[in-house]
Amino acid sequence: MADLLEKTRKITSILKRSEEQMQEDLPYNAITRQLADIIHCNACIINSKGRLLGYFMRYKTNNDRVEAFFQDKNFPEEYVQEANLVYETEANLPVTHDLTIFPVETKDDFPDGLTTIAPIHVSGIRLGSLIIWRNDKEFADDDLILVEIASTVVGIQLLNFQREEDEKNIRRRTAVTMAVNTLSYSELRAVSAILGELNGNEGQLTASVIADRIGITRSVIVNALRKLESAGIIESRSLGMKGTYLKVLIPDVFDEIKKRDY
């Protein structure tokens, strides 16, 4: 019991992860490594769309094709759809099962391979799946307890992070709307023309050329850019005779300007 408690504490420490760690490319490499070390298995976490959030390969069980999924950080759509239909932990699935993590061409190499899938959901929201696998030995009850605890911990962390991201998006959209509302008719035309000059979210432009083309003064463009920059929506840098370098920091401004029909 003491051993199980200590293992549980190691897993729940994931709740102390910072927001910065959550924004890493693979934010759950740490917990998959902990699980793999504690349970002696391979482990990975995917979200409900199949994006890889973290993995750790303790044992070589897959071929180049499957390892490409880990490199690309995406799982096959068919597999993800099947995994999303798992509502309770499915333990010790054989290599003949549709949800086995072992690729079909390696079944002869790992005939006793076993896969366990634990759904990650909080408050009825499906957030992803925690998948662990071994070459031969079955996962015991203690292993499954730890897996379910881990899936719950990851679910809570993912939900909190998702809510924080939603709040950030709302604040960003509000900032864009408020900034655009301060623009005059001429400034709106200027911003629309400027955004149309960019290559994606950034680019180089010449204010005087744009001003002449749409029939406004250069000062209108300068004022419009200053308002957006002070709101944190764009950043700009003078390139001297070459014009101005502009980068959009909050892409929502494209849709907001488009809604104004400029």
UniProtKB/Swiss-Prot annotation:
- Which residue intervals are the DNA-binding region? 207-226
| SUPFAM superfamilies, A to Z | Winged helix' DNA-binding domain
Sorted alphabetically, the keyword list is: Cytoplasm, DNA-binding, Repressor, Transcription, Transcription regulation
| Stretches for region GAF domain | 1-159
Q: In this entry, which stretches build a coiled coil? A: none
Gene Ontology CC entries for this record:
cytoplasm
A molecular function (GO) held by this record is:
DNA binding
User: Where does the UniProt entry say this protein principally localizes?
Assistant: cytoplasm
Q: Where in the cell is it found?
A: Cytoplasm
Query: GO annotations under biological process?
Result: negative regulation of DNA-templated transcription
Name the domain of life this protein comes from: Bacteria
Q: What function does the entry list?
A: DNA-binding global transcriptional regulator which is involved in the adaptive response to starvation and acts by directly or indirectly controlling the expression of numerous genes in response to nutrient availability. During rapid exponential growth, CodY is highly active and represses genes whose products allow adaptation to nutrient depletion.
In the record, the note on similarity to other proteins reads: Belongs to the CodY family.
Its recorded name reads: Global transcriptional regulator CodY
Species for this entry: Streptococcus sanguinis (strain SK36)
